[in-house]
């Protein structure tokens, strides 16, 4: 792996010195190997090691290089035609491949090659971008978007119209991460590398970026870029120091309890084989 990452890192530094037409075969092969690893889940842009999230920046660079090395080409889906550099993940898959993967894909859901969906993932008509990792038992509901290189944990529910930010444009240092057993309410947006820690519930219509104040009404503490584990978060406002106006904030109203869990529990019937 160190050799692969070294090739990618060096190629990214030298990217102005070659084109898709004259790219050295070693670089092209390394990029393809990295994308294939992201696609089958053996590689991840970010992973939790000893309780801390570690970002493998070289894999993000591999994704960016793949855009440089591949030309646009027609992509067909029934009567629809597209023109892009990245193939769709499930193009040409057989019934046996879908059964082996254990993923349910509802038309017209789209996942790009280089993204990974683990067993018992359900993709309603949604979009999963390259480099994203969606772990076991998660549902990506209708019109939800999982951005490039985003990391979605086990047994997560991304409700209708949810947006999970990517890293490619505007260029972000770290991916957005939704940890295990989280519930993200309809039309909420989590972006800019924010981490929603395990077991949290985000209400409908909550918008969180790195500069969003996340206010804990019980302790008075303000967090940035991180929703503490087990939080229940709703949209709100905080007053200015002079009391003349208020600005948007995400408010932690309580910790998850049995009542919250009952309202946001996952339905195993929807994930049965």
Curated annotation (Swiss-Prot):
The keyword Amino-acid biosynthesis applies. It is found in: Cytoplasm. Its EC number is 2.3.1.117. It catalyses: (S)-2,3,4,5-tetrahydrodipicolinate + succinyl-CoA + H2O = (S)-2-succinylamino-6-oxoheptanedioate + CoA. Substrate binds at residues 104, 141. One of its GO terms (biological process) is lysine biosynthetic process via diaminopimelate. Coiled coil: none annotated. Keywords: Acyltransferase, Amino-acid biosynthesis, Cytoplasm, Diaminopimelate biosynthesis, Lysine biosynthesis, Repeat, Transferase. The keyword Repeat applies. Its main location: cytoplasm. Pathway: Amino-acid biosynthesis; L-lysine biosynthesis via DAP pathway; LL-2,6-diaminopimelate from (S)-tetrahydrodipicolinate (succinylase route): step 1/3. Gene3D superfamilies: Hexapeptide repeat proteins, Tetrahydrodipicolinate-N-succinyltransferase, N-terminal domain. One of its GO terms (cellular component) is cytoplasm. GO terms for molecular function: 2,3,4,5-tetrahydropyridine-2,6-dicarboxylate N-succinyltransferase activity; nucleotidyltransferase activity. InterPro entries: DapD_Trfase_Hexpep_rpt_fam (IPR005664), Hexapep (IPR001451), Hexapep_transf_CS (IPR018357), THP_succinylTrfase_dom1 (IPR023180), THP_succinylTrfase_N_sf (IPR037133), Trimer_LpxA-like_sf (IPR011004). Homotrimer. PANTHER family: 2,3,4,5-TETRAHYDROPYRIDINE-2,6-DICARBOXYLATE N-SUCCINYLTRANSFERASE, MOLYBDENUM COFACTOR GUANYLYLTRANSFERASE. Belongs to the transferase hexapeptide repeat family. This is 2,3,4,5-tetrahydropyridine-2,6-dicarboxylate N-succinyltransferase. It comes from Acinetobacter baumannii.
